[in-house]
UniProtKB/Swiss-Prot annotation:
Single GO MF descriptor: translation initiation factor activity
Protein name, UniProt field: Eukaryotic translation initiation factor 3 subunit I
Signal peptide annotation: none
GO biological process, one term: formation of cytoplasmic translation initiation complex
Keywords associated with the record: Cytoplasm, Initiation factor, Protein biosynthesis, Repeat, WD repeat
Function statement: Component of the eukaryotic translation initiation factor 3 (eIF-3) complex, which is involved in protein synthesis of a specialized repertoire of mRNAs and, together with other initiation factors, stimulates binding of mRNA and methionyl-tRNAi to the 40S ribosome. The eIF-3 complex specifically targets and initiates translation of a subset of mRNAs involved in cell proliferation.
GO cellular component terms listed in the entry, alphabetical order: eukaryotic 43S preinitiation complex; eukaryotic 48S preinitiation complex; eukaryotic translation initiation factor 3 complex, eIF3e; eukaryotic translation initiation factor 3 complex, eIF3m; nuclear periphery
Gene behind the chain: TIF34
Localisation: Cytoplasm
Pfam families: EIF3I
Organism: Scheffersomyces stipitis (strain ATCC 58785 / CBS 6054 / NBRC 10063 / NRRL Y-11545) (Yeast)
Length: 350
């Protein structure tokens, strides 16, 4: 599984994202320009320039018509993918940590960070897709979800199926489910900080199952990742790692999940990958066992995205590189005998 190595950013990657078809890969980093790449060969299609600082998040709508970015320069920008032109900018009261289009592309959520005296909010904007009036977007959000005064700030968020709920992860390890129409909190769950003794339990990523968005995976600095059902809001599986996790994704076709993270570079005495645990980790989604690791980055993995058709994945690291992997035959041939596994589990319990 020899990857394509993309060198298009001057600083650490913050997010990589495929479009729905998987032919394009979008990336943002702690520099001030987003990049768009052909995922098949790594050729750069273009850059989106306009932010004045770090870009924390990027997302693309289902039709690959519009793209949104959120940054530390207190701006949410809307771009036309075909031309690379910024068509609209929303001002934010604080740095924007995450942007995400609803599944139908009609709405855009953004997390305004809880800093600079701002209490921290999740805002939702209605998106006008009319080509003739893309620059005419509503400046006021259609929904504002405020973090409770005594609550922890939201760090990541995403949409459930049909845009019915907004799921957010917070820096106290809790996950919240909000009604996407009213903003009312429907449910909450302590997903992190209960599986290990780690003090830092910040939720670092949320990604949904591609097929129906009925469940999602989280990652956290507590060295764990959890699989959670949207409907019941119960933890289905827990994947334990040996380093803080920054990102997690669910693979289609095969029952695997991919985790990425590693010790912060300043805490590592050598640059060896094994020393800092800078590998992408593959776990069996059902049995929770680690089944393999992929090396390559010389620093923590900050972001992982799986190709929509399940044929590969991309990772972005603290080292400033993107690695685009295509799975080989051994990946698809790998399988675990469920009956044998259940026998092992029974023996362990006995």
């Amino acid at each position: 599984m020899r990857p394509i190595k993309l060198m298009g950013h001057e600083r650490s990657l913050t997010q990589v994202k495929y479009n729905r078809e998987g032919d394009l890969l979008f990336s943002v980093a702690k520099d001030n320009a987003a990049s768009i790449w052909y995922s098949s060969n790594g050729e750069r299609l273009g850059t989106l320039e306009g932010h004045q600082g770090v870009i924390w998040s990027i997302d693309v709508d289902p039709d690959t018509h519009l793209c949104a970015t959120g940054g530390g320069d207190l701006a949410i920008k809307l771009w036309k993918v075909e031309t690379g032109k910024c068509v609209f900018t929303w001002e934010s009261p604080s740095p924007v940590r995450r942007v995400a289009f609803s599944p139908d592309g009609s709405r855009l959520l953004a997390i305004a960070d809880q800093v600079m005296g701002h209490i921290g909010t999740i805002v939702v904007y209605e998106i006008n897709h009319d080509d003739e009036s893309l620059t005419n977007q509503s400046t006021e959000p259609s929904l504002v979800i405020e973090t409770p005064q005594d609550g922890a700030k939201a760090t990541v968020a995403g949409w459930s199926a049909n845009g019915e709920f907004i799921i957010s992860g917070h820096d106290d390890g809790y996950i919240y489910k909000y009604d996407a129409q009213t903003g009312e909190a429907v449910n909450s769950l302590e997903a992190h900080g209960i599986h290990t003794e780690e003090k830092n339990v910040t939720v670092t990523d949320i990604q949904f199952a591609a097929e129906d968005r009925s469940y999602f995976i989280t990652s956290s600095k507590d060295k764990c990742s959890t699989l959670i059902d949207v409907d019941t809001f119960e933890i289905l599986k827990v994947y334990k790692a040996d380093a803080p996790m920054n990102t997690a994704a669910i693979t289609p076709l095969k029952d695997f999940v991919i985790l990425g993270g590693g010790q912060e570079a300043r805490n590592v005495t050598t640059t060896a990958e094994s020393q800092g645990k800078f590998e992408a980790r593959f776990y069996h989604k059902v049995f929770e066992d680690e089944i393999g690791r992929v090396k390559g980055h010389f620093g923590p993995l900050n972001t992982v995205a799986v190709h929509p058709d399940g044929t590969g994945y991309s990772s972005g690291g603290e080292d400033g590189f993107i690695r685009v992997h295509t799975f080989d035959k051994s990946y698809f041939d790998f399988y675990v005998d469920a009956a044998e596994k259940n026998t092992e589990k029974s023996a362990e319990k006995a």
